[in-house]
Structures are given as C-alpha cells and as structure tokens.
C-alpha cells in the first residue's frame, strides 16, 4: 500500500500528461496547445497557428510541451499508411417499409382478405 502511495505521489509530482493521436501519413494534424506560453520540445516541424493551435505533418513522432507551471504534455502521433475508412463503401442494404413492392404486396393481401371475409359472411 505504501509503495502505491509513493508511486502516485511521484506521478503527481512530475505532472506529465500524455496525449495520443492517430493520423494518416502525409496529412497535417491540427492540435490545440495545452498552455499558451509553452516551450516546444521535439524534432518535428512545428507550425503555430491562431487560437493556441498548432499544425504538424503526420508521421510517427514524439514531442512535448513544457508549460510555465511545470506541467509537461507529451504527445505521441501514430501515422498509418492508409485510413481504414477511406476506401470502405457505405452500402446500407435495407428495404424501406414504404417501398413500391411492399405497398403492392400489402394492397393485394388486403384485397384478398376483403374478398375472403365477404365470402364467409354470405
């Protein structure tokens, strides 16, 4: 129990937060800066933008921001060669309730039922 408390105390003292992002290789990733006056620590080209955002080219990379309050935000980008949703065809094969075929069949069943009920009552 004391070991768990000690490890928790060490983790809180370092104040290191981790952020993970998946992206398609070669695209640009838009991320929000964790703190406005942070120091960038990394080897990837970093492009600061308005509203405390920044852009990075997607590649498998590891970088960090060190904030003035001592908090360190570590980012891990994981690049994929192809997006899995890029080439998937969205074919939803389902039949609507009010399709013409359904309406024709329903009308025929209704007419047949009307005639059979009428014959039974005679």
UniProtKB/Swiss-Prot annotation:
The keyword Metal-binding does not apply. A motif (Di-lysine motif) lies at residues 118-122. Gene3D superfamilies: SARS coronavirus X4. Residues 16-96 are virion surface. Residues 1-15 form the signal peptide. Its main location: virion. It is a single-pass membrane protein; Single-pass type I membrane protein. Residues 16-81 form the X4e domain. Disulfide bonds join 23-58, 35-67. SUPFAM superfamilies: Accessory protein X4 (ORF8, ORF7a). This is Protein 7a. It comes from Bat coronavirus HKU3.
């Amino acid at each position: 129990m004391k070991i768990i408390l000690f490890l928790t105390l060490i983790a809180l003292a370092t104040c290191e937060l981790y952020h993970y992002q998946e992206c398609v290789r070669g695209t640009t990733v838009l991320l929000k800066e964790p703190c406005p006056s942070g120091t960038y620590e990394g080897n990837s080209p970093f492009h600061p933008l308005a509203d405390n955002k920044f852009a990075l080219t997607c590649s498998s990379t590891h970088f960090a921001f060190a904030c003035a309050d001592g908090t360190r935000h570590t980012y891990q980008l994981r690049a994929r060669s192809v997006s899995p949703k890029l080439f998937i065809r969205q074919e939803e094969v389902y039949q609507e309730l009010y399709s013409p075929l359904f309406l024709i069949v329903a009308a025929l069943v209704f007419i047949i039922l009307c005639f059979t009920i009428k014959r039974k009552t005679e």
